[in-house]
Amino acid sequence: MSIGILGKKLGMSQLFDEKGNSVPVTLIEAGPCRITQLKTTALDGYTAVQIGYGLSKDKHISKPEKGHLLKSGEELLKHLKEYRVEETSSYEIGNQITVKNFEVGQKVDISGKSMGRGFAGYQKRHGFSRGPMSHGSKNHRAPGSTGAGTTPGRIYPGKRMAGRYGGKQITTKGLLVLKIDDQKNLLVVKGSVPGKPGSIINIKPNNIVGKKGGEKS
């Protein structure tokens, strides 16, 4: 499996295709990332490539982590991510990972932290139907029954109820790469991706067999 790249979500915009149709797109500042470590079966029990992204101040980095990062370059990096690979001979510590690793027409999987919406009710969080809104109704946005009575005498774990909505790590798969600007480290993908503008996201090649740009992991 090929390694991915870390980036920052800039926001959404639109492009127009050859027929004049508006296509919603997300702009991503992808990389550049630096290879900070190569893990091997002999030393670590598995093979992987670790990359770093985003500059960090010296006061925010612990001494052990600082020593680890300085082995691959002079700049201290804020975010680290590793990718499992079959072998590490084609990678070298200190090398840069950029948007040139991707190509237009390729499909990618993008992971990020979804936007937190705080405490939300049944309708907003789970899409429940509401009750009658007419005068006299006492069940406008109530959930209805949450279970039986004496047996089981409790609410089963996992019951869909009101609670904290969003703020979870999710992945959107099979997004099409429409445009690449390697001068600005810009990656343009079709559709939306998790997170708010400015959030850190992980972009990796789609591994669904049979899809364009995908490969067998």
Curated annotation (Swiss-Prot):
DNA repair recorded as keyword: no
A GO BP term here is: translation
Molecular function terms in GO for this entry?
Answer: rRNA binding; structural constituent of ribosome
The UniProt annotation puts the region (Disordered) at: 127-162
* Domain of life (superkingdom): Bacteria
Q: Does Acetylation count among this protein's keywords?
A: no
Q: Which residues fall in a compositionally biased region of kind Low complexity?
A: 142-153
One GO cellular-component annotation of the UniProt record comes to: cytosolic large ribosomal subunit
List UniProt keywords, sorted A-Z. Answer: Ribonucleoprotein, Ribosomal protein, RNA-binding, rRNA-binding
User: One short Pfam family name for this protein?
Assistant: Ribosomal_L3
- What does the protein in this record do? One of the primary rRNA binding proteins, it binds directly near the 3'-end of the 23S rRNA, where it nucleates assembly of the 50S subunit.
Q: Family, per the entry?
A: Belongs to the universal ribosomal protein uL3 family.
Assembly information from the UniProt record: Part of the 50S ribosomal subunit. Forms a cluster with proteins L14 and L19.
The name under which this protein is listed is Large ribosomal subunit protein uL3
Which organism does this record belong to? Answer: Prochlorococcus marinus (strain MIT 9301)
For this protein's source organism, the top of the classification is: Bacteria, Bacillati, Cyanobacteriota, Cyanophyceae, Synechococcales
